[in-house]
Regions:
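A glycine-rich beta-turn/hairpin centered on an aromatic-Pro dipeptide
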Residues: 170-198
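C-terminal interaction segments
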Residues: 2-6, 70, 88, 212-262
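Internal, conserved structured core segments that host functional sites
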Residues: 94-146
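An N-terminal domain-cap segment
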Residues: 2-51
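Glycine/small-residue-rich hydrophobic helix-like segments
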Residues: 188-225
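Hydrophobic packing residues in well-ordered alpha-helices of helical domains and bundles
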Residues: 17-20, 50, 107-110, 114, ...
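Short, helix-capping/interhelical loops that line the mouth of catalytic, cofactor-
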Residues: 2-15, 62-115
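Short, contiguous alpha-helical
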Residues: 40-80, 129-178
């Protein structure tokens, strides 16, 4: 019998809504200080410039009011843990759209997006369905995915500019937990315990299940290293060599399971 599909943990809606706005504000403040030369500079995301990345970040938040303004679909098609794997199929469309975003005035763009987001979510129910390009999901779940987009791309922006943009604690927590739960769903089991303090602990990989005492197979890392591994920004071997990941036990090698999303 195949293993039961993992049920997503619950997220505090009020905190998630606030976290999206808080992280976007952090990015907005940093973007306002970027010079034209910095905006035209490269990123680690292929051919994207910093300006492309800035536009993409705005779009990730702007998608909330835009989807809420569209008619609601008839039925839910996506659970929260389905989302990470579905993004890969939309990569080409996302790239094309990002390159077409008008970001000549980043400050004006971000001011408009922040205002539209706050107005749109103010009276919207978590159960409201949104029609994404690859399926329908609830607003509550979609907002959790926005924390992933914002935190991961904040890290990209920091890497490209050295801006030192801070991470909202709640946004970083939600991002970490969703990607950790995605790993547990992708490789169900109890042989390996993955610890990402202070936000998440999950068990994964088939094999003997740990019940008490110290687990025989343990992986531990920090949240930013985890999101870089989970999204392919870095590689398992490199982070092990840099001592950003500790892995003990014969099954504690996650290299074959990563990345979880691109």
């Amino acid at each position: 019998m195949p293993p039961a599909k993992k049920r997503a943990r619950s997220y505090d809606s009020v905190k998630t809504r606030a976290a999206v706005l808080a992280q976007f504000r952090h990015v907005r403040e940093a973007v306002a200080a970027l010079t034209p030369e910095q905006l035209d500079g490269p990123t680690r995301l292929g051919e994207w410039t910093v300006r492309d990345l800035v536009g993409h970040l705005a779009w990730m938040v702007d998608s909330v009011p835009r989807l809420l303004a569209a008619p609601a679909p008839a039925a839910r098609e996506l659970a929260l843990l389905d989302w990470p794997s579905r993004t890969a199929a939309a990569a080409e469309r996302i790239d094309e759209h990002t390159r077409g975003i008008e970001a000549a005035d980043p400050a004006g763009l971000y001011a408009r997006v922040a205002e539209d987001y706050e107005k749109a979510v103010a009276g919207a129910a978590d159960e409201r369905l949104l029609q994404l390009s690859f399926g329908a999901m609830t607003l509550g779940d979609f907002l959790v995915t926005r924390t992933v987009e914002l935190v991961v791309h904040t890290d990209d922006l920091n890497a490209a500019t050295g801006a030192g943009i801070p991470y909202d604690r709640q946004a970083l927590a939600a991002c970490t937990r969703l990607l950790a739960d995605t790993l547990a769903m992708t490789a169900p089991g109890g042989a390996v315990e993955v610890r990402i303090p202070p936000y998440a602990v999950v068990q994964c990989v088939e094999g003997p299940r740990h019940t008490r005492g110290t687990p025989p197979n343990v992986v531990e890392t920090d949240p930013l290293t985890w999101l870089r591994l989970a999204t392919g920004r870095t590689e398992w071997a490199a982070e092990l060599d840099a001592a950003h990941v500790s892995a003990s036990g014969e099954r504690a090698d996650l290299s074959g399971l990563l990345p979880l999303m691109g």
